């Protein structure tokens, strides 16, 4: 099992393996993805703050791109954006609203993920994901070559 699958496999599956926006009912997938990374960073280093630059690096984004997205999350009440004056850096924290909604979504994802594994089987599910990734990569390459 990949490291990514070990921690919150149901969230990882729906965020990275099975990209279906309809799974999410209270939070948009794009928002949930950022919130998920904030949560993972908080859980992996609970004694430290989640600095925007570190989060951007973990997500493979530019700080300016992530900054815009985090601003929208703050407007929706999902994060609190603060400044660490001592470190001279900005950091984010999940709001209680985000924690609550993510918990609801996670329960639903757990249910769906378990049912998929039970009815389709672990191996078939992995093969399906691999096929979907291959198809997506082909489409991406075609998009790049045709402009």
Spans of model-derived segments:
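A short alpha-helical element within helix-turn-helix/winged-helix DNA-binding domains
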Residues: 49-58
């Amino acid at each position: 099992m990949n490291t990514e699958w070990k921690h919150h496999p149901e969230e990882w599956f729906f965020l990275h393996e099975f990209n279906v926006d309809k799974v999410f009912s209270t939070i948009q997938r794009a928002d949930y993805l950022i919130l998920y990374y904030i949560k993972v960073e908080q859980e992996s280093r609970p004694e430290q703050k989640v600095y925007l630059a570190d989060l951007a690096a973990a997500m493979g984004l530019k700080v300016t791109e992530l900054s815009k997205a985090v601003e929208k999350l703050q407007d929706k009440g999902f994060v609190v954006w603060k400044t660490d004056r001592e470190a001279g850096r900005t950091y984010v924290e999940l709001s209680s609203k985000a924690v609550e909604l993510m918990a609801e979504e996670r329960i639903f994802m757990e249910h769906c993920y378990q049912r998929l594994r039970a009815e389709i089987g672990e191996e078939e599910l992995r093969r399906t994901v691999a096929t979907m990734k291959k198809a997506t990569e082909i489409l991406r390459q075609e998009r790049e070559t045709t402009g």
